Amino acid sequence: MVSKKEKSVVLIDGHSLAYRSFYAFIRNPLRNSKGQNTSAIFGFVNSLRKILNKFSPQYMAVIFDSGKETFRHKLYEEYKKERPETPGDLVSQLPLIKEVVSAYGIKVLEKEGFEADDILATIAKRLAKKGTKVYIVTSDKDLFQIIDENIFIYDVYKDIIYDKEKTKEKYGINDPSLMRDLLALAGDAIDNIPGVPGIGLKRALDIIHRYSSFEEALEKDERLKEHRQLAEISRILATIKTDVKTKIGLKELQIRKKSIPKLIKIFQELEFSSFLKELSTDMPKTVYQEPLFKDKAHIALKRKGIWGFKFSNQTLFVCDGEVDKKITDKDKIKEFLNSSEFKVGFDIKSQMHKLKEFGCELALPYFDTQIAAWLLDPTRKRYEFSDLMLHNFKLMPKMVSDTEQARLNLMLFQKLEPEILTFGLDKILYEIEMPLIKILYEMEERGVKIDTGLFKRLSTEIEIEKIKLKKSIYQQAGVEFNINSPQQLAKVLFEKLKLPKTKKTKTGFSTDSSVLAELAGSAPIVRDILRYREITKLQTTYLTPMQGLIKHETGRIHCQFNQTGTATGRLSSSNPNLQNIPIKGELGKKIREGFIAEPENLLISADYSQIELRILAYISNDEKLKEAFINNEDIHLQTATMVFNKPKDKVTNDERQIAKMVNYGLIYGLSDYGLASSLGISNEEARNIIDEFLGIYFQVAEWRQKIIEQTKETGYGKTIFGRIRPFPGIFAQNRTIYESTVRAAINHPIQGSAADIIKKAMIEIDQEMKNKNFCGGMIIQVHDELLFEVEKNRIKEAQMLIKEIMSKNYLDDVPLVVNIGIGENWAVAHETAK
């Protein structure tokens, strides 16, 4: 570790670090919600933080290449000519990297006509002569030549500081200055330093050790004599200049105070939440300052009865912008919560759970700042209170008192509600999302009964099957190995068993499910491996975790439903994630069998049939599509008859499946390549099928084009009911980002409207079931399905009520069809739905 007391200078080779940072994520680039590649900036900042922590320097600079030709290009035309062009995604990040460095208070340097290495070396040598320790951060070999008693190279990725001794260990040269000779002889492919033909690193080292100087080697070595001119040019190219004219000294390199507001703005734009959290340590402990609330009337928005609130530790903290109150009397808390006062809170569903423990309930009207922020931009990754304060006010609260949070909720309301009104989101907010909060809270409280015995039996069965599969796999492989290790599995399949190799990854040949599925037909061992993976995932993802989630007192799982978890408006769930339970197949069915009703109740499954295709028919106003649904036709069969030009009775099952894939695929932006891959046909055949489809349902094709144009015009998409989703990627130059955005933009009005419809149905069903005094109610919402637990003696009444509400004509003349089934467990209820 570097001594904190030591006066030291850190000089960073900016381009070198930016390149390494960018390519560290090349297989899985980091992007923010706008589709912007942020890999280089993230990696650079991460390294910068590590460097600052390790060296605690008082003096520092980051030096960049100017991007212009240098004296080396004039000397040797081919210099760096073979280096691939800098990727556009990296070039676009360099200005932001420089901005971040400056915001950290660190000097940014570049000089036209010289490379960063030359400027860096000049400054380093000048300071080292005065006894200052200089640490150079780079991955370039050429800078090793200036290492001396006071100059060191630091590899930030390997966390190694190179001095003379370590340089000798790494490169085999007795003195770091010999690095230029090594590069001159062996060449450097990265910088296109030619070197001497036929001489590699080993031979170059041999020459360096044999002769006392480079000049002697040129005179005596036969190969060098033959290529003397090339060797001399290579040595000039490899020699770092240490005499660049610059007035930069220690004073200019002093680190200034970092600009937290600038860093917050940049990190917020890039969505670097981990870095933002770290910045909070530099912020004051509290964020509330009286001046924020000087204009009392403005805070109250000229409306009476608007209160920010926070419930904590059996105390209700409220604020109306003028008065702060701390209510501890339970009756008064109840009175306030049930009043007609407009209550503004954050994550109100969580507040409801806390209030229930205290014996209180919260009644409408209320405004949830978290949900409002999500509605305005559902593409952000996080909606924690600190994120909202940062995003809206550039404030980074480290610690907020309960009183302050009540006040800050009012600030957020003041900022968010006008935006909600501007984007026409008030109906979505007040008529759908706010009433839904209490329904989800009650679903979480209600939970769902679990057949623990069945889950235990299933776990035992899986363990037995895993043992059998392992034995079979080892016998077929002829060796025991770790089946869960992709590297070991690849070695067995592709090296030992000589199975056909497919796509290659960084660590070897791929063994992902798509690859194994291709091999399964010809290799029984692969079928066993796929089955082993399938049941292992079932065990580790569902059976084992679920048993740990069962509440001992109730024998029920109390899943968490997340209102702000998706960009489409759909609900998500966690603890457990019900969305990921397999819909089809034996395993999905077995898990659903474990979700049961109490002895006196039954479960009702209500599932929308083809809701997304029906929405597509409605919003595209395609006559053929609408007609099929109005006449209750088999839409996939109808599509198949038209695409393949056959009468209905001549259409094969395979052709109907292709039509189904195209029908649904077009909602999700299925490409000809995607269809070709799924069906095992050529891209041209797939293109013809899609063109045929769009020719038949031409109004769908027109609607798709209209949606793309509207999204380009506004930058966001809308559902039937007005839910919005920003699509900044629609303006992207990167083709991959643009095409991905187009697919999402086409899908949003369909999937988002489906989310709105099921939420509207949930609200109305909940109200009706309460009006009619049902004991049970909704327990699960997943995909397009609702699951209810209802008393047996009222099951028919509940079925009729649910079906009637869910089938309402939200889509005018396009009917919504709901399949309803009942059973003692979820699997039976789902399977009997019709």
Model segments located where?
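Non-catalytic, usually N-terminal nucleic-acid engagement modules in DNA/RNA processing proteins
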Residues: 1-65, 71-72
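Extended two-metal-dependent nuclease catalytic cores across DNA- and RNA-processing enzymes
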Residues: 2-6, 27-31, 81-247
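Function-dense linear segments that define catalytic or interfacial modules
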Residues: 375-399, 403, 409, 563-648
